[in-house]
């Protein structure tokens, strides 16, 4: 571009010189001088330029170590020299230096960008001539080495590859000339390559390790080492969620879920009801997301829960886990049907059937027990059925719902009224009380009678024993000397307890004991012990039947049969009027 502009300016000067005589006439002296100078310049431009030569002190140099010196050889005078590099006008920098006449170009510190072709261009008037081309080769490198894997993913200082994939290794290092490669592999069974690339088919865990490549430049005598660490990722399999086997109770326990997997270099994600789980105050994750803790269990925390393990090449999710959270029982409800409303009072007809249902929300299912206020019987089951209502079925029925896992229980009651009962002045309870009272009174009466009878019998026996003793010692006052004829008419009495009329009592001669000393009347020994004593034994009283024979009985007899027939003691009983 510079040379083209230079030639354009020369032609402009010539055209202006040709036009000036026709448009403007200077003084004669000036015109003469101008014509003389123009003729002189024209003669000079027409003089041919000698051939140019370009030389360089060395065509091959080492970067940062050597310098390059170019020399433009020409004998022409009054010339202008321009330097051209790689077909472009050379732009000097701090590493380049020109001589005073511009014939010498020196590159003090050679860089790789200084490589290429160089020439010098000489301009003499309107004539331009170029020198020959000189090439400069700059040897450099190798630069820092980088090992690339086309099927891997960088994770920090590690490159991860999927198990079973084909992996291509490629070394990137700037160097001139082409360097030599020496590989150092983690496995001895891999043949070390001699180029900058090599391939492993179906990579496995055995191929993990450090891969090193030494790149050497034989010209610059420089070497650099490249290193890459390779990890082989397994294709992940589905994990499992582990949780405690203890019973989970609402508001009473917390639970920790663990995502169990055999893979080490994997990430873990949690899902709740198919959506990514968001941690909260009640849902907390460990540092590596391996465990999920649920604080203060609620009945809505049943899930399902899933955990997913993944790497950049594969992923797998666990089977959904649904928790069993025990709670309840909640409020107990008593109804007359499976889908009817809650009742507190029920009126039912006599002899009709009645079915009551007891229900309460509970996990596990609650246990139900029915009780009646007038009975100690306990019935199990959610349903209570009465086929025919009677009077005794009236009253309050209570249903108790209990949960054996949570240890909680609740109850509810309903009043059952039987309509159509027969009117009665007393209730069944009152009647039962009266019957029981009567039985108790009868028992008391029997006991009292037995007690009185026993007391009287004992008293009678003691009296009889006393009278018998007296009869053996004191003669009775009313012993009659009866004839045999009189003994056939009525029995003889030992004691006469019948009161006598006053006149008869006064007129009758009473037998009395003698006034002698008692020692003269009583004997110290019984008659049996002294048979020859002064006293004679008493005559034996003939035994008479209690009652005379039937047909021959005297109807006006004043004697009746005694109660105690076992005793031979009789008394006279005054007949009633």
From Swiss-Prot:
Q: Has keyword Phosphoprotein?
A: yes
Q: What do we know about what induces or represses this protein's expression? A: In intestinal epithelium, up-regulated in the presence of Gram-positive commensal gut bacteria. May also be up-regulated by interferon gamma (IFNG) and butyrate (a product of bacterial fermentation).
Which tissues carry this protein?
Strongly expressed in the small intestine and colon (at protein level). Minimal expression in other tissues (at protein level). Highly expressed in cecum, colon, ileum, jejunum, and testis, and also detected at lower levels in salivary gland and thymus.
Kindly provide the PTM information from the record: Phosphorylated on tyrosine residues by SYK, SRC and FYN in vitro.
Covalent S-S links between cysteines: 72-120, 259-307, 358-399
Q: Pfam families, from UniProt?
A: I-set (PF07679), Ig_3 (PF13927)
Q: Where are the transmembrane segments?
A: 431-451
UniProt-annotated glycosylation sites, renumbered to this chain: 78, 102, 289
Q: Which PANTHER family does its entry note?
A: CARCINOEMBRYONIC ANTIGEN-RELATED CELL ADHESION MOLECULE 5-RELATED, CARCINOEMBRYONIC ANTIGEN-RELATED CELL ADHESION MOLECULE 8
**The name this protein goes by in its record:** Cell adhesion molecule CEACAM20
């Amino acid at each position: 571009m510079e040379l083209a502009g230079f030639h354009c300016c020369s032609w402009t000067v010539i055209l202006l010189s040709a036009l000036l005589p026709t448009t403007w006439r200077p003084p004669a002296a000036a015109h003469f001088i101008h014509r003389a100078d123009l003729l002189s310049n024209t003669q000079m431009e027409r003089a041919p330029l000698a051939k140019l030569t370009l030389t360089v002190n060395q065509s091959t140099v080492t970067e940062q170590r050597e310098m390059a010196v170019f020399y433009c050889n020409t004998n022409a005078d009054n010339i202008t020299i321009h330097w051209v590099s790689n077909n472009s006008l050379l732009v000097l920098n701090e590493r380049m230096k020109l001589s005073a006449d511009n014939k010498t170009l020196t590159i003090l510190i050679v860089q790789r960008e200084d490589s290429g072709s160089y020439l010098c261009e000489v301009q003499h008037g309107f004539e331009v001539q170029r020198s020959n081309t000189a090439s400069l080769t700059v040897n450099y490198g190798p630069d820092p080495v980088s090992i690339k894997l086309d099927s891997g993913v960088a994770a920090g200082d590690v490159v991860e590859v999927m198990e079973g994939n084909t992996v291509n290794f490629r070394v990137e290092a700037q160097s001139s000339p082409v360097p030599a490669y020496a590989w150092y592999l983690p496995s001895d069974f891999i043949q070390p390559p001699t180029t900058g690339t090599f391939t492993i088919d179906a990579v496995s865990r055995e191929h993990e390790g450090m891969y090193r490549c030494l790149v050497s430049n034989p010209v610059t005598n420089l070497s650099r080492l490249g290193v890459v660490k390779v990890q082989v990722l397994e294709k992940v399999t589905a994990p499992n969620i582990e949780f405690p086997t203890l019973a989970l109770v609402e508001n009473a326990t917390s639970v920790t879920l663990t995502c169990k997997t055999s893979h080490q270099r994997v990430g873990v994600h949690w899902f709740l009801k198919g959506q990514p789980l968001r941690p909260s105050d009640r849902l907390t994750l460990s540092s590596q997301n391996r465990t999920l803790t649920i604080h203060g269990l609620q009945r809505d925390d049943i899930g399902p829960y899933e955990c997913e393990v993944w790497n950049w090449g594969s992923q797998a999710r666990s089977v959904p886990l649904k928790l069993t959270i025990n709670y309840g029982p909640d409020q107990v409800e008593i109804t007359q049907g499976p889908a009817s409303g809650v009742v507190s009072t029920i009126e039912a007809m006599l002899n009709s059937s009645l079915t009551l249902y007891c229900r309460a929300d509970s996990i596990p299912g609650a246990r139900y027990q029915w009780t009646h206020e007038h009975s100690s019987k306990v019935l199990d089951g959610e349903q209570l059925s009465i086929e025919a209502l009677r009077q005794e079925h009236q009253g309050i029925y209570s249903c108790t719902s209990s949960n054996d896992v949570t240890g909680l229980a609740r109850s509810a009651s309903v009043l059952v009224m039987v309509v159509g009962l027969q009117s009665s002045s007393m209730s069944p309870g009152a009647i039962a009380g009266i019957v029981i009272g009567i039985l108790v009174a009868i028992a008391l009466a029997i006991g009292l009678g037995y007690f009185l009878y026993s007391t009287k019998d004992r008293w009678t026996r003691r009296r009889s024993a006393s009278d018998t003793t007296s009869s053996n010692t004191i003669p009775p006052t009313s012993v009659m000397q009866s004839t045999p004829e009189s003994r056939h008419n009525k029995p003889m009495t030992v004691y006469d307890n019948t009161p006598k009329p006053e006149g008869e009592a006064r007129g009758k001669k009473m037998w009395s004991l003698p006034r002698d000393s008692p020692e003269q009347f009583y004997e110290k020994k019984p008659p049996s012990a002294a048979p020859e004593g002064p006293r004679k034994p008493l005559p034996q009283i003939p035994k008479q039947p209690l009652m005379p024979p039937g047909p021959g009985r005297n109807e006006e007899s004043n004697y009746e049969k005694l109660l105690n027939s076992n005793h031979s003691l009789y008394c006279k009983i005054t007949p009633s009027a």
